[in-house]
Amino acid sequence: MQTQPVPEHQGWASRRPTILARRMRAGIAVLLLAVTISGCAPSAVHVSQHDPDNLRPTACEQAWTRARQSERLQKEQADTRAQAWVQAARECPARLDEATVHAAQALAASQGGQASRQTATLRLVQAAQRLDPLAKALPVELADQAITGEDRSGFELSVLAARKTDAAWMLTLADAHTAAAQILVGHAKHDPRQGVYPTTDLLAHPDECTDPANGIQTPTPALIEMDTARTLLAVGKKLNGSSGTIRTDASQNAKSHQQATSALVDMIVAHMSMAMILGYPATSSALLQTPKH
């Protein structure tokens, strides 16, 4: 028996459900893909637009990284290393002590002998001459602390100089302290300077003494410089606000703020480097001790 051919229109009708099902499945897949892509697109754009900002390092982080990298420089590039750490101290007041110690170490390591003492004295004189912006930013209590610290150091150095025959450099150093106190008192509400301070311990140990902060034996002029640096470090720490920056009057602009910060950092580094050049041990553990008096 022969099989009758199926009419063409009947074959199409029998295959239509299968074809329609395939087309429907393909359409649904395309629709789902479009929804998925449209749903994911905003997230991708959000990440690409905002993540770089969230990961961008702060000014402090950038300055600290550059300072750490500068440690690879050679000894003859100590000024560059010191400046990198000075900038880190300006940008990271919460790490003021550590950064200023590194800056002073870099300066002291590159120098030696009488020439370095003259250079360090000049640096201190110049730093003192730039203290006016800091004087404007200091509240009364901290101004008294900074002024008295500088004035006492100037007096003590002048007393030591009077006992020596070749102490012209020490008188110049004493004058720098006195000038710093004078500039700082220029914007103070009162003058806390005593002019004369106790000398019993000083005269008992005019050449070498013990640092009460850590028990280290050091030349007396070096300890005077280190104590002055520590006094200013304490002032700087108390000036640090909750945002990690030096507090200034609301009317002061960004430039005045920057100048006050720079003046404080430069003076601390000048005192520290002078202390090291005069014989204070240049180890970080000794330099970061807090004085007990």
Describe the predicted segments one by one:
Residues 6-28:
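Bacterial N-terminal signal peptides that target proteins for export
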Residues 36-39:
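C-terminal motif of bacterial Sec signal peptides marking the signal peptidase cleavage site
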Residues 41-293:
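All-alpha RGS (Regulator of G-protein Signaling) helical domain and cognate RGS-like helical scaffolds
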